[in-house]
From Swiss-Prot:
The keyword Zinc is assigned to this record: no
Keywords in alphabetical order: Aminoacyl-tRNA synthetase, ATP-binding, Cytoplasm, Ligase, Magnesium, Metal-binding, Nucleotide-binding, Protein biosynthesis, RNA-binding, tRNA-binding
Record-annotated membrane-spanning stretches: none
Organism whose genome encodes this protein: Shouchella clausii (strain KSM-K16) (Alkalihalobacillus clausii)
Lineage, top ranks: Bacteria, Bacillati, Bacillota, Bacilli, Bacillales
Annotated ranges, domain FDX-ACB: 714-807
Record-linked Gene3D superfamilies: 3.30.56.10, Bira Bifunctional Protein, Domain 2, Ferrodoxin-fold anticodon-binding domain, Nucleic acid-binding proteins, Phenylalanyl-trna Synthetase, Chain B, domain 3
Subcellular localization, as worded in the UniProt entry: Cytoplasm
Matches recorded under InterPro entries: aa-tRNA-synth_II/BPL/LPL, B3/B4_tRNA-bd, DNA-bd_dom_put_sf, Fdx_antiC-bd, Fdx_antiC-bd_sf, NA-bd_OB-fold, Phe-tRNA-ligase_IIc_bsu, Phe-tRNA-ligase_IIc_bsu_bact
Name of the molecule in the record: Phenylalanine--tRNA ligase beta subunit
GO biological process, alphabetically ordered: phenylalanyl-tRNA aminoacylation
Enzyme class: ligase
EC number of the protein: 6.1.1.20
Residues binding Mg(2+), per UniProt: D464, D470, E473, E474
CC cofactor note: Binds 2 magnesium ions per tetramer.
């Protein structure tokens, strides 16, 4: 936001305060001033000149010899090459001895035999950016408007207000109230405790009513809470007076014509976007605001043909769009030199609708920037009256009485209770309620004492003030951050410790790293196709309202798709051994249309591909397989103290190998799975043989951990027995081990698998599983007979329950 120091003085008396002091004060109060720009880039001795005579140069086709009155006894002769120079003009003249930006000094000269005593200047030569110069003067000298009263010899630099400073404000998103001159004036009024002077808005209306010219309707009051149209007849379109042009250029806006310039001026003054339509070009007495139709065509003021969508809001003449609401007007209803009657639009559009509309159009304007952040809806009509007043003053318009209005605003006062004790405790002050009330009055926030609290009514212009803490900040800003007392923190020092969940998370990640895995971190947003890849049938992927791209349009429902991408990325770069884990959130919802927040679930995913362990110097390699992955899972459960509560049962899942997929159960409830990726999926994704695991971390951390029990080093020897059981292929090792443990009683210390065999010499549909069993008595030496008796009992029980046969 660019703020002219001279313009600012129209609203508040600050002539005794320098721009540098203002910048320092505002920066210290929370609104940063990035730069102070001086409009005069080094120009001196430039005056108003009257071109009395113009004659062609006798020896140069493109030069003219001008006799110019510059307020001295005699006219001066100046040779000028501008194509638009003509007698009867008032122009800016750099006298002999003057200096112009860039260190140029004007001297007496002789051009093709003709004396030249000065220079008729363009605005660019006075240091004004070409992008801000009115289009009619881009390629020539500047000519003062006929309506402007100037005299030869007047200081032209003062008329152009080049002896001005411009403050560049770096506003944070919450301070959109300072995106206009009055907002900055309110801020300074609070900082310096000075009154505000409001602009003139009283319009001379005629008896003729606007009702006979225009009527207004809106399709949706939420999209358009307020819309007002004024009608102004008999306007004379022409250039704006210099003071208006100067202020627009100081704010970084190019002057166009008096009516359009007024709308831009009020935008900068009130922060209220306005738009002027040519009444006759509207070709209708109706203005209707609605959503655009699918594929509806519309040409904006910049000449671009645009295809609209129902997400965009348009102003129509009842038939077709005449403006992209809150963003830009239409080419066919713009104000031109032929315009005589103007319809002045002043409206409040919903910020989100304008933001979406501007984004879809790829078009961001000064108007949309203000609508997006929210405008003061209570000042819309006042801003319209201000614009009507200015048009009446500088374009000779006749303002018809009344206005066409559609009003769906919901009016409510924002009253916040300020607890004085809490405020003083928070900001470290000891202010009385009277002192705080005085600060609120400086902000022009009405307030009253209710009990021990101060009830503050927040004006609509300050949309950033919504909670007591916002008022605390305002008090601290006005009181002065530098004045806040310095105090040391008070409190008892306590030894910090991790929560149980933090400790488990650290143990889990430490174990995974020790198992040789590397951590991966991927985006929580994915494509809709990947989000649906592993989602349960009841889970509906959640679409982001305004995604940056299709690849980041949906909240993920699984960690695996991105791990697949990472694995493929590594394989494509000849890194064939990929051992990864990722811990992150997934977002789950069963709603087709989201009305409640989705469930955010923390998960752990593991991906293994290639070689798990390699010792080249020994010639040893171990490729990843299902049992390596299951071993990592079992080690993790042991680390978390959950081994006895976990079961692994065969499972079938889409996208995974039907014979190498297991459901992971915690106390009978599924918390995830481990599996080999199906060969067809591996081929489609350019993966090698790949194994994955995905677990619900929330469920793991919520489970009751088994207590660690100390067991001393055994004092008595153990006896080991082996057994090889031939069972059906459907019988799992886990089932056999459960029977063995139950039948073994107290004497059985451990049981482990040391061999699984299928193939030659084995009956069809059968497999052999060999177990090693260790027996030990806790209080004495176990005899061989006791161990044999226990072993035979186990064999008998296994045979009874499963039909197993001892393998010879």
């Amino acid at each position: 936001m660019l703020v002219s120091y001279k313009w600012l003085q129209e609203y508040i008396e600050i002539g005794d305060i320098s721009p540098q002091e203002i910048a320092e004060k505002m920066t210290r109060s929370g609104i940063e001033i990035d730069f102070i720009h001086e409009r005069n880039k080094g120009a001196t001795n430039v005056v108003v000149g009257y071109v009395a005579e113009v004659a062609p140069h006798p020896d140069a086709d493109k030069l003219n010899v001008c006799q110019v009155d510059i307020g001295e006894e005699e006219r001066v002769q100046i040779v000028c090459g501008a194509p638009n120079v003509s007698s009867g003009q008032y122009v800016a003249v750099a006298k002999v001895g003057a200096r112009l930006p860039g260190g140029i000094k004007i001297k007496k000269a002789k051009l093709r035999g003709q004396h030249s005593n000065g220079m008729i200047c363009s605005l660019q030569e006075l240091g004004i950016d070409s992008k801000l110069v009115p289009k009619g003067y881009v390629d020539g000298i500047y000519v003062f408007p006929e309506t402007q009263s100037v005299e030869p010899g007047q200081d032209a630099l003062a008329i152009f207000e080049l002896n001005d400073s411009v403050l560049e404000l770096d506003l944070t998103p919450n301070r959109s109230d300072c995106m206009h001159m009055l907002g900055v004036a309110y801020e300074l009024a609070a900082l310096y405790d000075r009154p505000i002077k409001m602009p003139k808005t009283k319009v001379k209306e005629v008896i003729e009513s606007a009702d006979g010219y225009i009527n207004v309707s809106v399709e949706n009051g939420e999209d358009t809470p307020f819309y007002q149209a004024l009608v102004i007849k008999d306007v004379k379109i022409g250039p704006s007076p210099s003071w208006l042009q100067n202020r627009l250029m100081a704010a970084g806006i190019r002057p166009i014509s008096n009516v359009v310039d007024v709308t831009n001026y009020v935008l900068l003054e009130y922060g209220q976007p306005l738009h002027a339509f040519d009444y006759h070009a509207l070709a209708s007495k109706s203005i209707h605001v609605r959503r655009a139709k699918a594929e509806e065509a519309f040409t904006t003021l910049d000449g671009e043909k645009r295809t609209l969508s129902p997400e965009q809001l348009v102003v129509t003449n009842g038939r077709e769009p005449v403006a992209l609401a809150g963003v830009m007007g239409g080419l066919h209803s713009e104000v031109t030199a032929a315009t005589t009657t103007v319809v002045l639009e002043a409206a409040a559009f919903h910020p989100t609708v304008v933001r979406r509309s501007a984004r879809l159009a790829g078009l961001r304007s000064d108007s949309s920037a203000r609508f997006e952040k929210g405008i003061n809806q209570e000042r819309v009509s006042e801003a319209a009256r201000r614009a009507a007043y200015l048009i009446q003053e500088i374009a000779g318009g006749i303002v018809l009485s009344g206005a066409a209005i559609a009003d769906a605003r919901v009016r409510s006062e924002r009253v916040i209770a300020l607890d004085l004790d809490k405020m003083n405790e928070r900001i470290g002050t000891n202010l009385s309620i009277m002192e705080v009330a005085a600060l609120m009055r400086r902000l022009q926030f009405p307030c009253e004492k209710v009990g021990s609290d101060l009830h503050v009514t927040v004006p609509h212009r300050r949309g950033d003030i919504t909670i007591p803490e916002d008022l605390y900040e305002e008090v601290a800003r006005l009181y002065g951050y530098d004045e806040l007392p310095s105090t040391l923190p008070v409190g008892n020092t306590t030894q910090g410790k991790r929560t149980a969940e933090q400790a488990k998370r650290r143990k889990m990640e430490a174990y995974l790293r020790s198992a040789g895995l590397s951590e991966a971190i991927s985006y929580a947003l994915t494509s809709s196709e990947k989000a649906a890849l592993f989602a349960a049938e009841t889970i509906k992927p959640i679409q982001v309202a305004m995604p940056m791209s299709e690849e980041r349009s949906t909240m993920r429902t699984s960690l695996l798709p991105h791990l697949y991408d990472i694995c493929t990325y590594n394989l494509n770069r000849k890194n064939n051994d990929v051992l990864l884990y990722e811990r992150g959130s997934v977002f789950l919802s069963e709603q087709e249309t989201l009305t409640e927040l989705p469930t955010e679930q923390e998960r752990l995913a593991v991906l293994l591909s290639g070689t798990y362990m390699s010792h080249p110097w020994q010639g040893e390699k171990k490729a990843v397989d299902f049992y390596v992955l299951k071993g990592i899972a079992e080690g993790l459960m042991e680390t978390l103290g959950l081994s006895e509560q976990i079961e692994y049962k065969p499972d079938v899942r889409p996208g995974f190998h039907p014979g190498r997929t297991a459901n992971v159960l915690l106390k009978g409830e599924s918390i995830g799975f481990l599996a080999q990726v199906h060969p067809s999926t591996q081929k489609a994704l350019d993966l090698n043989e790949t194994y994955v695991l995905e677990l619900n971390v929330d469920a793991l951390f919520a489970a009751e951990t088994e207590a660690l029990i100390y067991r001393g080093i055994p004092r008595y020897p153990a006896i080991t027995r082996d057994m090889a059981l031939v069972v059906s292929k459907e019988t799992t090792a886990a089932e056999l081990m459960a029977i063995i443990r139950e039948a073994g009683g107290e004497l059985l210390e451990t049981v482990s698998i040391f061999d699984v065999y299928e193939g030659e010499h084995m009956e069809s549909g059968k497999k052999s599983i060999a177990f090693s069993l260790t027996y030990r008595h806790a209080e004495r030496t176990l005899t061989d007979e006791e161990a044999s008796l226990a072993h035979e009992g186990i064999v008998a029980e296994v045979q009874k329950q499963t039909g197993a046969v001892l393998r010879a």
